[in-house]
Amino acid sequence: MTGRVCRGCGGTDIELDAARGDAVCTGCGSVLEDNIIVSEVQFVENSGGGSSAVGQFVSLDGAGKTPTLGGGFHVNLGKESRAQTLQNGRRHIHHLGSQLQLNQHCLDTAFNFFKMAVSKHLTRGRKMAHVIAACLYLVCRTEGTPHMLLDLSDLLQVNVYVLGKTFLLLARELCINAPAIDPCLYIPRFAHLLEFGEKNHEVSMTALRLLQRMKRDWMHTGRRPSGLCGAALLVAARMHDFRRTVKEVISVVKVCESTLRKRLTEFEDTPTSQLTIDEFMKIDLEEECDPPSYTAGQRKLRMKQLEQVLSKKLEEVEGEISSYQDAIEIELENSRPKAKGALANLSKDGSGEDATSSPRCEEDTEDEELEAAASHMNKDFYRELLGDDDGSEAAGDPDGGSRPLALESLLGPLPTAASLGISDSIRECISSPSGDPKDSSGDGELDLSGIDDLEIDRYILNESEARVKAELWMRENAEYLREQKEKEARIAKEKELGIYKEHKPKKSCKRREPILASTAGEAIEKMLEQKKISSKINYSVLRDLNSKGGGSPPRDDSQPPERASTKKLSRRKRATTRNSADPGTSTGKRLRPLLSAQPAKKAAVGEALLLSSPALGAEPVKPSAVLVESGPVPYHPEEDADEEDAEDEDGEPCVSALQMMGGNDYGCDGDEDDGY
């Protein structure tokens, strides 16, 4: 029972069936309601043990499709791979779209394109950044936003051709017809970057008018819109007295200089370029030009046809020239006088040759004849120059009948100095002294003799020319002057703050004079004087060492070996006694360097051999212990001087190197060796 009343009978006994969703009056049987919708929230348990609300909308990329381990395990396995891909794609699209300043509608459209690419597996094997950039550029093309593919390439630092390849693939696979880009979309953007100031709108409108004219003349199809925009903006800026250089326009529209100049050249070939500024702003030509590619093809075809016609005419002219040349050669052959003497013999020899010889042999024969004729002609010419008279020639040449023809008889009269008009010049050259050199030690003044005053006046600029040249120089070096001015201002500011550091002038390196020496030793000595190898070497001691080693007396080989050995043994005994009496001296001798030269070494070897011989009856000497020097060897010149005086008083031979190094004590005193 409910509080509702039946509209048919007025009864209140109404039965509600929640399963069928209807309300029926039990009195009259009329159906009061059917398909009753319950507004309460119901939950359904799924197969995994989780619960979900009934009637809740779950999107394709929503969180409702996340798998779980069931109600007993509250551990989430995470999203599917495709859900993660879509989420990352949305994040990257919003990031790039914010940098390009795209609205939310464009971003949603780009994300829909990305979902279509993911569903068709177009992202496999391609970087996500490339696919996202292609989707954004698809939106820019379809929505008509002033963005270029080069902008996305700059943001991603990717080659523009790689992005273009991905864009074409997506457009083909997704069946999206991207419309052609209208260059007029980029004019306001580029005009704002070129900073035209108050005339920005006027320059933009003029550039748009130029672009419309280019589109009518078929310059738009197949061309990048940035190149057309750059050419239109450059012309519009010049029309409104703005000096925008080609480099400035290139830096804004992102095209190379050759492309911009090519667009200007193509526009120059149209009839619109022949109009003045006022005529262009008022008149619209109805006729359209042919596309530049078609015009270039027709020009190439005409050039090829013209080359063919010229080649045919050239062949005809060459045939006529060859016929004329043959006729001239025949006439010259007939008018040539008969040769005598050596030339006649040569002609007879040539006529006696076989007529069936090859053309190459005939050419060789003609060359030989010409050489022989030239040699005879040169002889006659030299004789005329030397002034030989006919009498002397006759006396010098007894066989005058066999003399060949003169040069005049063959070639006619030769040109003389008078006929050439150079006789005066030759006379001046002969009369002027050739050996007097010109005085080169002048007083610094220019020799202007022979130069006209008008020519000198042309070298000097007047005021207007100097002013124009100065303006040209200032315009060409404006950037350098601006940099110098900024540099001076920066230096002045640093000087005021006290942080300026003056650069020390570079010292000029003087070239050392070469070492002049007659021997290698002298050169080394001079080199050591200029630059010492080490500051720890006493070079004076080295000089004394060289003088002592070079001046040591040689051994007397004529002395009997027994006497020499006796003296050396006595010297050894005396030295042993002295060393045993003064152990400090022995230790000092051990530390002394080897000061003797090569002869002293040889003497030490000889003494060692004599001491080791059994005939003398001396005891065998034990092998000396190895000395290890732990530092620099001290040198005592006073002790060496005392020893040298003592040796001179005894009148005995020089002390050997073994004795100077304390070799007589090696292996004998164990106490001294313990110190090393």
UniProtKB/Swiss-Prot annotation:
Biased composition (Basic residues): 566-576
Annotated binding of Zn(2+), by residue: 6, 9, 25, 28
Region annotation Disordered: where it falls in the sequence: 342-371, 386-408, 425-449, 543-603, 617-653
Domain of life: Eukaryota
Residues annotated with Phosphoserine modification: 449, 552
InterPro entries per record: BRF1_TBP-bd_dom, Cyclin-like_dom, Cyclin-like_sf, TFIIB, TFIIB_cyclin, Znf_TFIIB
Protein purpose: General activator of RNA polymerase which utilizes different TFIIIB complexes at structurally distinct promoters.
Summary of subunit composition and partner proteins: TFIIIB comprises at least the TATA-binding protein (TBP) and the B-related factor 1 (BRF1/TFIIIB90). Interacts with BDP1. Interacts with MAF1.
UniProt protein name: Transcription factor IIIB 90 kDa subunit
Organism of provenance: Mus musculus
Gene behind this protein: Brf1
